[in-house]
C-alpha cells in the first residue's frame, strides 16, 4: 500500500512539474523525502532479531533483571542426525522494543566443536527435522514446509498450502508426511455475522470455549500428504468432519502422532 501511494505521489509531482527551477527543486526534495521514508520502512521491516553479543552489559551490576532475561536466547526443539554426529536445534530471540520474537535454526557437531547458523533472514524458522537419511533438514517458515541441505544451502519450498502448517512428521520411508493445520470451528463460539466482521463480542453456546490463553475458534487436524519430486500436496484430513482436535490443545504437538515402522499406519491421540 505504501509503495502504491509513493508511485501516485511521484507521478503527480512530475506530471505538473514546470521548468521553474524553485518549483523543480521543491518537487525533487519532496520526492527524495518520500523515497527515504519508504526505504526506512522497508529496512525496519527486514530488521533481523538475533543474539545479543553482551548480555552482561544489560544487567545492572550483578543482578538478574528483566532486561537480562529478555536478552537471552531460549533454546527450543532439538533433533540428532541419523548418524548421531550433528544436532539441529532452535533458539528464540526477543526484542522488547519491537515487541516480537525471531526463531532461528542452528546445527552443532556432537562434540560441540563445530557450530553453524542456518537462519540468515528476518523470517522465523522452526520445527527442524532430519529427512532423506540425514542429507536434508525439513523446517517451517511463513506457514509453509521447506527443506534445505544440512549446511543451510539449496532451500526448497515443499508446500503451497492455503492454510498455515503448524507441525509435520515424515513417514519412515519418506514418501508421506503428516501436516498439522487448524480449521475454523464454531460449535462453542458463534461466528461473527458477515456484516460485523470486527465485532469483539462473543456468543458462547458451550462450556468448552477456551484453552488457557485463547478462545476455541479453530481446531487442529492432521492431514496425510504425498511427498513427490515436485513437493508435497495438500493432503487428506484423517479426522475429516469430526469436531475434535489432534494434536490436543493446549499442550499437545506432533509428538501425539506416530508412524508405524512400515509407514502404513498412524497412531494418534485425540479426545473424543
Region spans (language model):
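Sec-dependent signal peptide recognition
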Residues: 25-33
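Boundary at the C-terminal end of the N-terminal hydrophobic targeting segment
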Residues: 43-45
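Predominantly five- to eight-bladed beta-propeller fold
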Residues: 47-52, 102-103, 179-230, 236-240, ...
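Multi-bladed beta-propeller domains
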Residues: 49-74, 100, 107-124, 131, ...
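Beta-strand-rich domains and repeat architectures in extracellular enzymes and scaffolds
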Residues: 67-103
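Conserved beta-propeller blade repeats
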Residues: 72-87, 120-138, 155, 162-180, ...
Amino acid at each position: 500500500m505504501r509503495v502504491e501511494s509513493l508511485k501516485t505521489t511521484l507521478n503527480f509531482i512530475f506530471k505538473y512539474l514546470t521548468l521553474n527551477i524553485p518549483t523543480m527543486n521543491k518537487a525533487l526534495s519532496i520526492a527524495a523525502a518520500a523515497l527515504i521514508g519508504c526505504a526506512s520502512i522497508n529496512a525496519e521491516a527486514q530488521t533481523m532479531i538475533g543474539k545479543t553479543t553482551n548480555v552482561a552489559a544489560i544487567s545492572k551490576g550483578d543482578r538478574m533483571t528483566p532486561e537480562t532475561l529478555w536478552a537471552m536466547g531460549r533454546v527450543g526443539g532439538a533433533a540428532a542426525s541419523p548418524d548421531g554426529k550433528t544436532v539441529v536445534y532452535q533458539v528464540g530471540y526477543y526484542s522488547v522494543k519491537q515487541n516480537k520474537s525471531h526463531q532461528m535454526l542452528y546445527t552443532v557437531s556432537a562434540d560441540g566443536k563445530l557450530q553453524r547458523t542456518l537462519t540468515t533472514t528476518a523470517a522465523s524458522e522452526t520445527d527442524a527435522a532430519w529427512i532423506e537419511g540425514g542429507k536434508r533438514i525439513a523446517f517451517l517458515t511463513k506457514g509453509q514446509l521447506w527443506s534445505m541441505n544440512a549446511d543451510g544451502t539449496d532451500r526448497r519450498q515443499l508446500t503451497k498450502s492455503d492454510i498455515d502448517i503448524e507441525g509435520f512428521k515424515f513417514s519412515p520411508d519418506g514418501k508421506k508426511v503428516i501436516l498439522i493445520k487448524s480449521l475454523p470451528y464454531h460449535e462453542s463460539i458463534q461466528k461473527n455475522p458477515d456484516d460485523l466482521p470486527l465485532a469483539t463480542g462473543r456468543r458462547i453456546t458451550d462450556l468448552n470455549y477456551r484453552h488457557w490463553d485463547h478462545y476455541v475458534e479453530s481446531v487442529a487436524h492432521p492431514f496425510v500428504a504425498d511427498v513427490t519430486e515436485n513437493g508435497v500436496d495438500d493432503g487428506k484430513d484423517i479426522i475429516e468432519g469430526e469436531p475434535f482436535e489432534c494434536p490436543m490443545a493446549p499442550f499437545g504437538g506432533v509428538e501425539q502422532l506416530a508412524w508405524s515402522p512400515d509407514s502404513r499406519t498412524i497412531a494418534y491421540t485425540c479426545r473424543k
